[in-house]
Amino acid sequence: MKLNKMFLVGALLSLGFASCSKEGNGPDPDNAAKSYMSMTLSMPMGSARAGDGQDQANPDYHYVGEWAGKDKIEKVSIYMVPQGGPGLVESAEDLDFGTYYENPTIDPATHNAILKPKKGIKVNSAVGKTVKVYVVLNDIAGKAKALLANVNAADFDAKFKEIIELSTQAQALGTVADGPNPATAAGKIAKKNGTTDETIMMTCLQPSDALTIEAAVSEANAIAGIKNQAKVTVERSVARAMVSTKAQSYEIKATTQIGEIAAGSVLATITDIRWVVAQGERRQYLSKKRGTVPENTWVTPGSGFVPTSSTFHTNATEYYDYAGLWEDHNTNEAVISGTQVPTLADYQLQDVTGELANALSGKFLLPNTHKSGANAASSDYKRGNTAYVLVRAKFTPKKEAFIDRGKTYSDNTAVPEYVAGEDFFVGENGQFYVSMKSVTDPKVGGVAGMKAHKYVKGKVLYYAWLNPSTTSPDSWWNSPVVRNNIYHIHIKSIKKLGFNWNPLVPDPDPSNPENPNNPDPNPDEPGTPVPTDPENPLPDQDTFMSVEVTVLPWKVHSYEVDL
């Protein structure tokens, strides 16, 4: 597919790893060590067919290839866990990566990044014992260290799979008071270091094979792998969403007669296309956790939550993070908030500004999975529990689209002319109006008692699921988001008018449209319909946007969507 080749070429322009070497190597075990050990780290460019297709070398859905990324590994924490019962876990935490490891190399056979040791790790209490070695890289939030402190060997494996909370429920619901870029849950363990590289937390899926730590092994022999060398594979703890667009603007054509505009003629233009991501989880298992049914290979803390219209508002924040909706937020309603969506051509540029680099590099989120199914009844993926990309744009209809244009109200006052960039209303009959007054006045083309959607300053919204299970919008029942995967969404067209507000944000008082946690709230006009329901399944019965998604490992998934 031409798109995938172009995207991967652009992504691979930034291929590379970086190491960080600083003064001081972190905590160093007792200088009178009884032996040395070392550890070789392998980083696959993805995760691991099962019922939901996520446990394979080429995971469903829309898998197209791999992307090495540009990881900066700063710290390494190693845990030597004796096997066979209770005992002391010997650890070496926050070791400086640049001191202990060579720069990564790529294995041509497996395409894994291999991190070979250049300094041995002193061992004391683990000498003479058979251990398994667990690893955490870049514990930048200190969550792993806190979880694993003073854990007995017999309990360590279970503890390594427990939940870490990255954002509280309050932090997961941003407000305008938090500023334009509140910290997301994923942002606590994955950070972009300008345009150069990224520091992302990583953990091992499995510990090393059992290894007996022999006494009196020299540092040189441990480094060479002659004795006392463990091998562990690690993967990134977050997923990444990336969005691109075929064009920076689109023309929308009428499908029926709208005002004076005939079906098939240009109705409006779409410009200023921006995006944010939400409903990744706010917590995660420290190490990726396998599910008990094939329909959900990798479970997340919220895998069992299936919302109703009411429980979404009362319980969704127990599981999900919505702070990302406030990214690049502007308090001026006339300005479209969010990150500008780049074109595929932008990925080919050699000279990239900081702003464009931010757009090209995507956004991090925590994994979010549920039980998959072949229809609405069997799938647990619903609109209120599935990670989504929210696309915002400016919709400017032609003046001829307004059915009330040039007419006089029942009170003999003139209907004002529509001004581009101002509010407009779309009635349940599909016609455009300049005000709610026009919507209900039959004399100007309205209908008494008719409801309408208010579009504040022309802002429109579209949803895209990160990893839909089919290429057809009317049958994509599932959308698993798994760590160490990149989900690339390519907008190839925008076909219709989108939504006017976002109901997929928990509201502490659903009866009050003024939700302080929602940057795209209900405009609170009399009779404003709810665009979508959190308990609805994912498929669109009416397709607004055409999207192609590609999933990059990292595993890359990509698909196109028509909005």
From Swiss-Prot:
Disruption phenotype: Mfa1-deficient cells show increased autoaggregation. Double mutants lacking both FimA and Mfa1 lack major and minor fimbriae; they fail to adhere to host cells.
Gene Ontology BP annotations: cell-cell adhesion
Keywords annotated in UniProt: Cell outer membrane, Fimbrium, Lipoprotein, Membrane, Palmitate, Signal, Virulence
Lipid anchor positions (S-diacylglycerol cysteine): C20
One cellular component term from this protein's GO annotations in UniProt: outer membrane
Compartment annotation: Fimbrium; Cell outer membrane
Signal peptide: 1-19
Pfam families associated with the record: Fimbrillin_C
UniProt site positions, description: Cleavage: R49, A50
Lipidation (N-palmitoyl cysteine): C20
Maturation propeptide residues: 20-49
Annotated stretches, region: Disordered: 504-543
Superkingdom of origin: Bacteria
Compositional bias annotation for Pro residues: 505-537
InterPro entries, sorted: Mfa1_C, Mfa1_fim
Keyword Membrane among UniProt keywords: yes
Entry similarity comment: Belongs to the bacteroidetes fimbrillin superfamily.
Remarks, miscellaneous: The name (minor fimbrium subunit) does not indicate the abundance of the protein, but is derived from the greater length of the major fimbriae. In strain ATCC 33277 and strain ATCC BAA-1703 / FDC 381, major fimbriae are 300 - 1600 nM in length and about 5 nm in diameter. In contrast, minor fimbriae are only about 80 - 120 nm long. This length difference is observed only in a small number of strains, including strain ATCC 33277 and strain ATCC BAA-1703 / FDC 381, and is due to a loss of function mutation in FimB, a protein that restricts fimbrial length in other strains.
Biological role stated in the UniProt entry: Structural subunit of the minor fimbriae. These filamentous pili are attached to the cell surface; they mediate biofilm formation, adhesion onto host cells and onto other bacteria that are part of the oral microbiome. They play an important role in invasion of periodontal tissues and are recognized as major virulence factors. Mfa1 orthologs from different strains have highly divergent sequences, and this correlates with pathogenicity.
Subunit description: Structural component of the fimbrial stalk. Minor fimbriae are composed of a structural subunit, most often Mfa1, and the accessory subunits Mfa3, Mfa4 and Mfa5. Mfa1 interacts with Mfa2; this anchors the fimbrium in the membrane. Fimbrium assembly occurs by linear, head-to-tail oligomerization of fimbrial subunits. This is mediated via insertion of a C-terminal beta-strand from one subunit into a groove in the N-terminal domain of the following subunit. Interacts with S.gordonii ssp5.
Protein name, per record: Minor fimbrium subunit Mfa1
